A protein has these predicted regions:
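Activation targets extended, charge/polar-rich intrinsically disordered C-terminal tails
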Residues: 129-197
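A structural signal for the main folded, soluble domain(s) of proteins
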Residues: 47-50, 54, 126-129, 170-172
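Solvent-exposed, acidic/flexible segments
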Residues: 41, 107-111, 156, 160, ...
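Beta-lactamase-like hydrolase cores
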Residues: 1-13, 23-30
């Protein structure tokens, strides 16, 4: 991740911004093969949502709510500025080719509800079913209706979260009407969010 990309985050991050992470190297190159994106679309491999943004002239600190194999996290990230150089010590950010932002305009009440949901998910892990549903190759090979029916059957309690569905659930708790009857790839989620703007 380069200094220019970090500068963009430094200047523009706000509460409710969804971050899309794009990995470089072998993993980044095989993701398009396994997912449903159209030819030429570059799919992110992970998404998270930003809350609790605090900034001054030399530093921006925020928390990112995300769900992964490690379970739910609501972790601290900092981006610092030294002269005209922007940097972070966050290991996950450093591994990325780039990070793109999709800001969502939120009221203070929506932000509060989103943060409450993010905190409630700390440490919550999903089991084997969630791993299978989250596997990217399933995104490509299961017909949408079959996938949706499977998801609804396994998710009767509306608790099933992987990185992209975690964002959908979080935004619903915050007061946005995003359908919870399907499992979304990170790119599908980003497209849904862009319709909220």
């Amino acid at each position: 991740m380069n200094s220019e990309n970090l500068k963009d985050c430094f200047d523009n991050l706000q509460d409710g911004t969804v971050l899309a992470f794009y990995k470089s190297g072998l993993i980044g190159s095989i993701i398009p093969f396994f997912t449903r994106e159209n030819k030429g679309e570059e799919p992110p491999h992970h998404v998270g949502i930003v809350y609790d943004v605090k900034r001054n002239k030399r530093r921006i600190a925020f928390k990112i709510s995300e769900q992964g194999f490690h379970g739910g996290q609501y972790r601290d990230v900092e981006i610092n500025k030294f002269n005209d150089t922007y940097y972070t010590t966050d290991k996950y950010f450093l591994k990325q080719k780039k990070v793109e932002m999709s800001p969502i305009k939120m009221t203070s009440e929506q932000i509060k509800r989103g943060i409450e949901d993010a905190i409630a998910q700390i440490g919550v892990k999903y089991g084997f079913t969630r791993l299978v549903l989250g596997a990217e190759f399933i995104e490509r090979f299961l017909p949408k209706n079959f996938r949706r029916n499977l998801f609804l059957r396994l998710n009767k309690k509306n608790k099933l979260r992987i990185c992209s569905t975690h964002i959908a659930f979080n935004l619903n708790k915050a007061g946005f009407n995003i359908p919870l009857d399907d499992i979304y790839s990170p790119l599908e989620l980003i497209k849904l969010i862009q319709c909220l703007k």
